[in-house]
């Protein structure tokens, strides 16, 4: 059986790892062992933080919507409840964008949410009306 020399393959793998470690500080950018460990860890952080980014942005959108809605005299929870009762299905990212860039349109959304909340309050029977005194 012929002898297999792996110099070319090993060199290519090392080169690939060092390319990924560009911009790292100290030995981790130019020694294979340290670079490989640093690159592996950086990939774990990247995987984790792709998940965290979704949470962080949702929280940011909610804060922005809450601030804009409170200026209109509602709370975030009541606003979202009113939108769902009014049958308006807009996600939080778009609501946040509308609140920032198109305040007139956002005010109309708040008004329709308030209207839906008032309408349902008027049509819902009171639980204590039939209670015996």
UniProtKB/Swiss-Prot annotation:
Keywords, sorted A to Z: Ribonucleoprotein, Ribosomal protein, RNA-binding, rRNA-binding
Record carries keyword rRNA-binding: yes
Gene3D superfamilies, alphabetized: 6.10.160.10, Ribosomal protein L20
A GO-annotated cellular component: ribosome
Keyword hit for Oxidoreductase: no
InterPro entries found in the cross-reference section: Ribosomal_bL20, RIBOSOMAL_L20_CS, Ribosomal_protein_bL20_C
GO MF annotation: an example: rRNA binding
PROSITE patterns found in the cross-reference section: RIBOSOMAL_L20
CDD domains linked to this entry: Ribosomal_L20
GO BP terms, alphabetized: ribosomal large subunit assembly; translation
Family affiliation: Belongs to the bacterial ribosomal protein bL20 family.
Record function comment: Binds directly to 23S ribosomal RNA and is necessary for the in vitro assembly process of the 50S ribosomal subunit. It is not involved in the protein synthesizing functions of that subunit.
Protein name: Large ribosomal subunit protein bL20
């Amino acid at each position: 059986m012929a002898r297999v020399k792996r110099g070319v393959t090993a060199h290519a793998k090392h080169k690939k790892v060092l390319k990924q470690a560009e911009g790292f500080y100290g030995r981790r950018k130019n020694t294979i062992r340290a670079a490989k460990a640093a690159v592996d860890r950086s990939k774990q952080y990247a995987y984790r933080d792709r998940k965290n980014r979704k949470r962080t942005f949702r929280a940011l959108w909610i804060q922005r919507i809450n601030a804009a809605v409170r200026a209109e005299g509602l709370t975030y929870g009541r606003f979202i409840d009113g939108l769902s009762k009014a049958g308006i299905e807009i996600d939080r990212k778009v609501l946040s964008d509308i609140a920032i860039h198109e305040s007139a349109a956002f005010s109309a959304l708040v008004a329709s949410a308030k209207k839906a909340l008032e309408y349902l309050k008027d049509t819902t029977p009171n639980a204590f009306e039939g209670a015996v005194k």
